[in-house]
Amino acid sequence: MAAISDLSFMYRWFKNCNLVRNLSDKYVFITGCDSGFGNLLARQLVDRGMRVLAACFTKEGAQKLQQDTSYQLQTILLDVTKTESIKAATQWVRDQVGEQGLWALVNNAGVGLPSGPNEWLTKEDFVKVINVNLVGLIEVTLHMLPMVKKARGRVVNMSSSGGRVAVIGGGYCISKFGVEAFSDSIRRELHYFGVKVSIIEPGNFRTAILGKDGLEKHMRKLWERLPPETRESYGEEYFRIYTDNLKSTMQLADPRISEVTNSMEHAIVSRSPRIRYNPGLDAKLLYLPLAKFPTPVTDFILSRYLPRPADSV
């Protein structure tokens, strides 16, 4: 028991020694703080004594977060799909951080819907997701980078296991693959400025990313707007099984979202942040192996998850 106690003490000592100094003086800007990962991360960083600048999409989300935390947290409304909103947020952050710059930019804002079989979706469905998850992330980063460079700080980008292997149709996985590519490219470029870039690739966690209306209602809407010939080619049984499989996946989602926010926090406060974080057992044991298997093997495994269409050959 004494040996275990000593090892535990040494681990905590090393962990604390590897932290960035003067965290209480450093500013962190986080997008998507209404709920989920962004909301919990903002609270964790306030508890650490950091100065948190939290961007929310709704007034209600901003007010509740402000009420529940201390003076060290300030909120602003931000729509990452609108350039003017991003410009206003950038000026606000610049006014807050002054000459010391921005220690960490956390691009967390994201949406999951519309998603489904690609043929069931429209161009607008793809654009809606990509504009938030990828284009918005890129534009926020480009506006904030001068302040991050000044602080020799961090960029932490929220991707997904779906950014390593495409598990569902629609703009979600496409946008997350784009986040991976953008993050890899800026990491190499910003290395020379002393800026570190980390990518968070969670598995399946329970958040509000699928919106308020519910998955079944979303899938029914996609199905009912399809042309009759497309519905016939898939069949009602395909729709039912596909929807049930998605619902089962969501029901199995891990509610312990602190696994994700702890990874995000480590990327911000550690002197040696990782390039990639993979919170969640499914991320480590399922999605990462699927991403590394030969493509025909991955296709075979994932195709078993999809129902057979009525007109299959």
From Swiss-Prot:
It holds the Pfam family adh_short. It is found in: Cytoplasm. It comes from the Eukaryota. InterPro entries: NAD(P)-bd_dom_sf, Sc_DH/Rdtase_CS, SDR_fam. The keyword tRNA-binding does not apply. NADP(+) binds at residues 29-53. Keywords: Cytoplasm, NADP, Oxidoreductase, Phosphoprotein. Substrate binds at residue 160. The keyword Oxidoreductase applies. One of its GO terms (molecular function) is all-trans-retinol dehydrogenase (NAD+) activity. The modification Phosphoserine is found at residue 185. It catalyses: a N-[omega-(9R,10R)-epoxy-(13R)-hydroxy-(11E)-octadecenoyloxy]acyl-beta-D-glucosyl-(1<->1)-sphing-4E-enine + NAD(+) = a N-[omega-(9R,10R)-epoxy-13-oxo-(11E)-octadecenoyloxy]acyl-beta-D-glucosyl-(1<->1)-sphing-4E-enine + NADH + H(+); a N-[omega-(9R,10R)-epoxy-(13R)-hydroxy-(11E)-octadecenoyloxy]-acylsphing-4E-enine + NAD(+) = a N-[omega-(9R,10R)-epoxy-13-oxo-(11E)-octadecenoyloxy]-acylsphing-4E-enine + NADH + H(+). GO terms for biological process: retinol metabolic process; steroid metabolic process. One of its GO terms (cellular component) is intracellular membrane-bounded organelle. The active site is at residue 172. Its EC number is 1.1.1.-. Plays a crucial role in the formation of the epidermal permeability barrier. Catalyzes the NAD+-dependent dehydrogenation of the linoleate 9,10-trans-epoxy-11E-13-alcohol esterified in omega-O-acylceramides (such as in N-[omega-(9R,10R)-epoxy-(13R)-hydroxy-(11E)-octadecenoyloxy]-acylsphing-4E-enine) to the corresponding 13-ketone, the reactive moiety required for binding of epidermal ceramides to proteins. Displays weak conversion of all-trans-retinal to all-trans-retinol in the presence of NADH. Has apparently no steroid dehydrogenase activity. PANTHER family: SHORT-CHAIN DEHYDROGENASE/REDUCTASE FAMILY 9C, SHORT-CHAIN DEHYDROGENASE_REDUCTASE FAMILY 9C MEMBER 7. Belongs to the short-chain dehydrogenases/reductases (SDR) family. This is Short-chain dehydrogenase/reductase family 9C member 7. The gene is SDR9C7.
